[in-house]
């Protein structure tokens, strides 16, 4: 499913640029994605659109997010740490954070790998028609294993 999401991000500027589900499904199938993977991704994207509508409100700058035990188990320490990093860097506003958590909880298996969470964060930006800052974009695309430490 994550491969399909990355393909959509790389090939369509915004969700509005995507064709309807039926046509998009055919295109993705022609590119070589499996039907189950396509259906999972399209269903996940529908949930993302719903999350965008329901998490549009503002929260106080001093609000503190407390993760439920189920969220802690499903997301894992590394993913929660990454979300906190993005928040403290001022990149992820509270409504976007809630969208990320909502969509991460929609992934069946846990704990969620940070690499998968990065794709979710990228797709949240994409769904809102926003481009993350260049350094954050680099952080979302580059694996830690590929980094050179000076």
UniProtKB/Swiss-Prot annotation:
Q: Which InterPro entries match?
A: Smg (IPR007456)
**Which protein family is it in?**
Belongs to the Smg family.
Q: What is this protein called?
A: Protein Smg homolog
Q: Which organism is it from?
A: Methylibium petroleiphilum (strain ATCC BAA-1232 / LMG 22953 / PM1)
């Amino acid at each position: 499913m994550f491969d399909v999401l990355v393909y959509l991000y790389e090939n369509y500027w915004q969700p509005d640029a995507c064709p309807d589900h039926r046509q998009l499904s055919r295109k993705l199938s022609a590119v070589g994605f499996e039907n189950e993977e396509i259906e999972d991704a399209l269903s996940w994207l529908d949930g993302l659109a719903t999350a965008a509508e329901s998490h549009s409100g503002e929260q106080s700058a001093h609000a503190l997010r407390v993760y439920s035990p189920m969220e802690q188990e499903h997301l894992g320490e590394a993913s929660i740490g990454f979300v906190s990093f993005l928040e403290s860097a001022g990149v992820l506003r509270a409504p976007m954070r809630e969208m990320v958590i909502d969509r991460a909880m929609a992934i069946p298996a846990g704990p969620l790998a940070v690499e998968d969470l990065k794709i979710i964060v990228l797709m949240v930006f994409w769904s809102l028609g926003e481009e993350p800052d260049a350094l954050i974009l680099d952080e979302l695309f580059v694996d830690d294993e590929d980094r050179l430490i000076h």
